[in-house]
């Protein structure tokens, strides 16, 4: 199952990556993000669902979680929230 990891690039790059996966025959695409990029992942999913592939794609599943990461600067453990949004072809 194809996955798109959301980072700091423009939203359009991620939207087009998801659309391309569906155009290449994928039935499901998972959008993943951590921390501050969670809201960007939701924006990508909604743009794909309502603008680019309106009526063709639906949200299949949403998973939220948190994971511990070690801050490289301080060496301390931090908890970072994560999200996975599965888009499914209708």
From Swiss-Prot:
Keywords: Acetylation, Chromosome, Cytoplasm, DNA condensation, DNA-binding. It is found in: Cytoplasm; Chromosome. Acetylated. Acetylation at Lys-8 decreases DNA-binding affinity. GO terms for cellular component: chromosome; cytoplasm. Its main location: cytoplasm. GO terms for molecular function: double-stranded DNA binding; RNA binding. The modification N6-acetyllysine is found at residue 8. It holds the Pfam family Alba. GO terms for biological process: chromosome condensation. SUPFAM superfamilies: AlbA-like. InterPro entries: Alba-like_dom_sf, DNA/RNA-bd_Alba, DNA/RNA-bd_Alba-like. Binds double-stranded DNA tightly but without sequence specificity. Involved in DNA compaction. Belongs to the histone-like Alba family. HAMAP family: AlbA. This is DNA/RNA-binding protein Alba. The gene is albA.
């Amino acid at each position: 199952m194809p996955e798109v990891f959301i980072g700091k690039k423009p939203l359009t790059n991620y939207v087009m990556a998801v659309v391309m996966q569906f155009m290449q025959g994928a039935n499901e695409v998972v959008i993943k993000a951590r921390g501050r990029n969670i809201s960007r992942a939701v924006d990508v999913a909604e743009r794909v669902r309502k603008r680019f592939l309106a009526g063709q794609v639906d949200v299949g599943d949403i998973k939220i979680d948190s994971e511990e990461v070690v801050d490289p600067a301080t060496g301390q453990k931090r908890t970072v929230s994560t999200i996975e949004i599965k888009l499914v072809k209708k």
